[in-house]
Amino acid sequence: MNQHDHLDKFTSAWLTNYRATEKAIYCCEHCFGCCHLAVHATYPEAVAVAEGLTGTQSKRLTDYIERLKVALTELTDLKSYLKKHRQELGPCPFLDGQGSCSIYPTRPLSCRALLSTRPAVWCTVDFSKLDHWDKQAYESSLDRQVVAWPTHFVAATQDFGRELENTLLELMQKEKGWSLSGNFAVMVWLEKNSQLSKHHIATNQQVSDILTAYELNNHLLLDLTCGSQGTKSAE
């Protein structure tokens, strides 16, 4: 996928310049703190992964979807959803038993763009439980010229990643008349089970009906944009 190549080249150049200032990025192999976050992606990225799933990956994915559907019965707002996802739903279903990404070559733009300027422990901290002094110490340690404040993740790579995501969604909108983004694992599962990308869909309602049939037409999970005017659709 060309957008992935563009981001990888951009990130490589950015890292070279950043490390030349003797500053560190703490991401490394078998570090998977960020894999507990709800990963946002575009549907074309999910399609690319769904096409090559192994039996083990499919099983882990289905287990995750079942846990997620149960959790959604208790959630109504984005903040609660993101917190529950991070703390209770378990890591990304594509994380293998050794703590490595099993879809690394085709991982989405949002994963590629996430670079940590602080040690891994900060990627899993529940900031709502930190006292005032710990929060203050954390914030004072951040380089505001580099990070997406108030997080410790690099802003430049995330900004470029979002630009590339928008390009993918615009291309999908032009080709199909609708576009879909949101929870990456949910979209991979949806494509694996419904082959939505291969449907000949004549109306926006058909897309919404398919999401509803799979119990996934939820604004916390997916963002469906329909029609030439870019109308948003979600329950």
Locations of regions flagged by a protein language model:
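Short loop/turn segments that flank or connect secondary-structure elements
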Residues: M1-S100, Y104-E235
